[in-house]
Amino acid sequence: MAAQLNVEQLEVSLDGLTLSPDSEERPGAEGAPPQTPPSSAPGNGLGSGASGQQREPGEAAAEGAAEEARRMEQHWGFGLEELYGLALRFYKIKDGKAFHPTYEEKLKFVALHKQVLLGPYNPDTSPEVGFFDVLGNDRRREWAALGNMSKEDAMVEFVKLLNKCCPLLSAYVASHRIEKEEEEKRRKAEEERRQREEEERERLQKEEEKRKREKEDRLRREEEERRRIEEERLRLEQQKQQIMAALNSQTAVQFQQYAAQQYPGNYEQQQILIRQLQEQHYQQYMQQLYQVQLAQQQAALQKQQEVVMAGASLPASSKVNTAGASDTLSVNGQAKTHTENSEKVLEPEAAEEALENGPKDSLPVIAAPSMWTRPQIKDFKEKIRQDADSVITVRRGEVVTVRVPTHEEGSYLFWEFATDSYDIGFGVYFEWTDSPNAAVSVHVSESSDEEEEEEENVTCEEKAKKNANKPLLDEIVPVYRRDCHEEVYAGSHQYPGRGVYLLKFDNSYSLWRSKSVYYRVYYTR
């Protein structure tokens, strides 16, 4: 009786599975139902857990186990091994709490667990069990009843039996499935986030490299542009210095004498004035040079167009005369048709004279004039008013010419002029004539247009004779309107030879106003 009580109170833990047999259900106890072998129990839900003699060996059994594993994976949402692990964990946690399996069910759980871990029962390798070890004998008997059941079938039977004993297994597995799905979603989201961050990082890196390359290219282009501009500036500065040196060598004496007259005894002011005059002379020279280049280009283009239009219809002799008559010469920095030079196409009478007497001596090259301005217009006009002969009135529509013969002891002519309130046209010409009178004279004419109209009324023969007797005339400074009412206009020119300078004050464009001109001319050696 004592042995029976000890057995009834026995509670054994085998491989993590606790076995606590009840007195009512233990085999051999009074009032307990007879134990039936698990393999012959109908409707126990084990299916493939029967003895190996009832299974068909070979490929049919393997295919059946694989098919069962696929069905369970589809139903539970986990692979067979993962599902078995969840079921085993659920059994260990919930046994005796959420459900209370019977003694036979516990033996079945232990046997299936052993079948999964160790495979079929082998009496040669299993330790001996004592005669009084009731649980050990029951466990060995249950394990041996599984026969050659495969590991997969044992896991399937374990899950089925546990689900039959405790329906909460479905909720437990479902919660883990949801957790697994959430974890998978989080994993995918994290992977996508890392991928996006990596792509964004690569994109930003590429953009940064692109911006860096563009910046380097831009800096290189800017540096090249700055270098080119600096080289161009140095070249222009060097060219300017060369041109100014050449111009200053021509005008050094005139500017020095002019500055000495303006600021006698004040060397510093003289040097300042000379530098201003040299700079103005350079600017004027460059402006005239650009005008000459533009005029030459326009003349060449016009000549080319005329030759193309008229070349096909003119005979050979006419072509030669036309080409000779359209040649232009650059005199004093201005492009003009030299109608009175020995290089022009001669009139018939002049041609006969050249054949009989031979060609005339060629005229010397005329130097370019120097012109500048200075702002002391009020002091200049007050000084000029002291000499009444130095103030002339040019009436509306008139052209006043001041004739200044060259002086035997002089080599440069200087002029200065200003007006009261309005501008006036001004130009300088040189007449190749030996004037016996060295005094300055003033001549008034209505306008140059009237002279041209008078010349149109005479015949060609009379015009040719008149031109033959007329002295040669060269333009030094073309007639342009000057703002001499705002500042004093001054200039100088080197004598090209013996002759007469013609200073023209042109008011022919004014229909209503007369102009008062304050002027002064003098020569230097």
UniProtKB/Swiss-Prot annotation:
Basic and acidic residues bias: start-end ranges: 337-346
One GO term describing the cellular component: Golgi membrane
Positions of the ACB domain: 80-171
Residues that bear Phosphoserine: S13, S20, S40
Modified sites of kind N-acetylalanine: A2
Residue ranges, compositional bias (Low complexity): 52-64
Identification of the protein by name: Golgi resident protein GCP60
Name of the coding gene: Acbd3
Keyword annotations: Acetylation, Coiled coil, Golgi apparatus, Lipid biosynthesis, Lipid metabolism, Membrane, Mitochondrion, Phosphoprotein, Steroid biosynthesis
Coiled-coil region: 169-254, 448-470
Gene3D superfamilies associated with the record: 1.20.80.10, GOLD domain
Domain GOLD, first and last residues per copy: 381-523
Reported tissue expression: Expressed in brain (hippocampus, olfactory bulb, neuronal and glial cells of the cortex), eye, submaxillary gland, testis (interstitial and tubular compartments), ovary (granulosa cells, theca cells at late stages and primary follicles), adrenal gland (fasciculata and glomerulosa cells), heart, liver, and steroidogenic cell lines.
Phosphothreonine found at: T18
Bilayer disposition of the protein: Peripheral membrane protein
Domain remarks: The central Gln-rich region (Q domain) is involved in binding to PI4KB, TBC1D22A and TBC1D22B. The C-terminal GOLD domain is essential for giantin binding. The GOLD domain is also involved in homodimerization.
Subcellular location: Golgi apparatus membrane; Mitochondrion
Annotated region described as Q domain, given as residue ranges: 238-305
Bias (Polar residues) ranges: 319-336
Region Disordered: start-end pairs: 12-68, 180-226, 319-346
GO biological process, one term: steroid biosynthetic process
Quaternary data: Homodimer. Interacts with the C-terminal cytoplasmic domain of giantin/GOLGB1. Interacts with PBR and PKA regulatory subunit RI-alpha. Does not interact with PKA regulatory subunit RI-beta nor PKA regulatory subunit RII-alpha. Interacts (via Q domain) with PI4KB (via N-terminus). Interacts (via Q domain) with TBC1D22A and TBC1D22B; interactions with PI4KB and with TBC1D22A and TBC1D22B are mutually exclusive. Interacts with C10ORF76 and RAB11B.
A single GO molecular function term of this UniProt record: fatty-acyl-CoA binding
InterPro entries: Acyl-CoA-binding_prot_CS (IPR022408), Acyl-CoA-binding_protein (IPR000582), Acyl-CoA-binding_sf (IPR035984), FERM/acyl-CoA-bd_prot_sf (IPR014352), GOLD_dom (IPR009038), GOLD_dom_sf (IPR036598), Golgi-PI4KB_interaction (IPR052269)
Summary of the function given for this chain in its UniProt record: Involved in the maintenance of Golgi structure by interacting with giantin, affecting protein transport between the endoplasmic reticulum and Golgi. Involved in hormone-induced steroid biosynthesis in testicular Leydig cells. Recruits PI4KB to the Golgi apparatus membrane; enhances the enzyme activity of PI4KB activity via its membrane recruitment thereby increasing the local concentration of the substrate in the vicinity of the kinase.
